[in-house]
Amino acid sequence: MRLVAGRLGAIAWRRGMDEYFRRHDGQAATVEQFLAALGEANGIDLMPYLAWYAQSGTPQLHARGEYDPTRRVYSLTLRQHTAPTPDQPHKQALPIPVRVALLAADGRALPLPARDGEAARTDCVLELATPERTFVFDDIAAPRVASLLRGFSAPVRLYTDHHADDLAFLLRHESDGFSRWEAAQQLARSALDGVLAGAPEVPQLRIWCDTLADLFMTDIDPALLAELLTPPDYNELAQTCDPLDPAALHAARETLEQTLAHRLGDALGARHTFLLRSEAGGLDGASRGRRRLLNRCLRLWLRIDLELAPEVAATRYVLAPSMTERLAALGGLLAQDAPQAHKALQDFARRYDADAVTLDKWFALQAAVPRADTVERVAALQQHPRFSLRNPNRVSALLQGFAARNPIAFHRSDGAGYRLIEQALRDIDALNPTTAARLATTLKDWRRLEPQRRALLRASLQRLAAAETSHDLGDILRRSLG
């Protein structure tokens, strides 16, 4: 419904909601009736938005802008594409509301031509309902760059023709939080592409780090800053790699994190100290945002300071006023294999031995440690007195967490991670076929792997499929191999 709310705008949305309640208050209304009320109240046909419920896959939105200074005309071409899926080989164009602003060289949003009866505005919603369309803005002073999908106006993957300098400009000057974050993500992905290509110098990486270093010293919202300082998630990046080399992708992402940490340098420790002293344990949004930044600073600081930062993290673990902070400190120590990690792990196990939900987190943290020898650690943890294959939550925390969130260990080049999950599936299937089937879904993307790992994982799947399995597990295996 956020799609429709974004398409209509606040005033039209309220008008439509008033009409909806006038018609259906107290009734079990359908989505069709809801859209009909909103649309008819505003003279707009919203029924095409039902296609979002019926069509699988995430649309890709490609944007290309062009400015004609002679005619003072800015043209924005939008194109959408949704990749075919086995259940729907032919995808239709969806209605995609795209909130747009054009920023001037000083960062101001340029005034856009007003429609009849409307006040002047600095952004607008363009609806792309066809595979491709060009939108023309007349009488526009020279724009520096277009800001797209403001307010996350549609759940799509955005691809633009913005250069690294354009993205850095948006990151510095855009007032919309989502557009700012999207610019940071695109710039990070561009830097990562350069690292993966083995380029001796990656200008995008320098621009990304320099821009974030400048923002780090401003009074930007802490919650937003924490997100800007976080590169795209590994699993998200993996979806765009074909073939996928998990080790290379993980190493490239580590390069981004390490380079950013060195660029921020001593400022990380100083900001962490400041945030820690001002932390009062509040539950409001601002307090949660400060804690998010506090934890992000600690993770980056631990990468470059091998003496003071681990001691601070160990102290934070002991004195943490919340589970969020305790887990962040422990996770940071584990990720960097700090000497203090072992003692903290032992303390956590003792402290929460009787708390099953919290102990799940203890298993999950260890399963996610980004080291090749985590395969052996996970195998050993299966023998822990508090681990049981009969406990679905414990299996999910340790084994599913390992396979889904630890690319370095799970995709180890010798196939040990695959064999670990293969054996676990055999054991679990005899006890709980539903849990086994859920765990098996972590193996389904084997075709996208580079040849060596693809062959190893396929062999594991074939051995499982050849054995006697439950209907639930067998169905997942057949679909994965079919």
Question: Where are the regions a protein language model picked out?
Answer:
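Amphipathic alpha-helical substructures
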Residues: 1-74, 194-214, 435, 449-458, ...
